[in-house]
């Protein structure tokens, strides 16, 4: 059970598997499992699914899950999530910490790839739009879960979660 805002797991996979550890910036499947056990969603949406960790865990736990990602053709900045969910899970890039389009996947940069936004301010603006769009897919009483970390550049800390619009 998730009992705090800080999650720790000594092993990446403890009786559950998912996604690809080779995908830069992914999260451990035990985090998805703990969140599902805490919230008990019947339907999950993951509009920034990356290698599919959340969907893999949902499937193993018998939870319906819709997944999309920019590398699959779904653009959270302009596309509507096609389901209504009890839990929308968003794990965005941390600005340009890992550049995705044209680097991790694909041959070309994508214009709405948040990891390629030219500056931190425009990244935060785009991130806020993505979160707003994700929120629109929630069922009444649903939860929007956002996994985000801080960014440090040239000795300066950028606390992404503090800078997001709530």
Task: Annotate each language-model stretch with its function.
Residues 1-166:
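Class I S-adenosyl-L-methionine-dependent methyltransferase catalytic core
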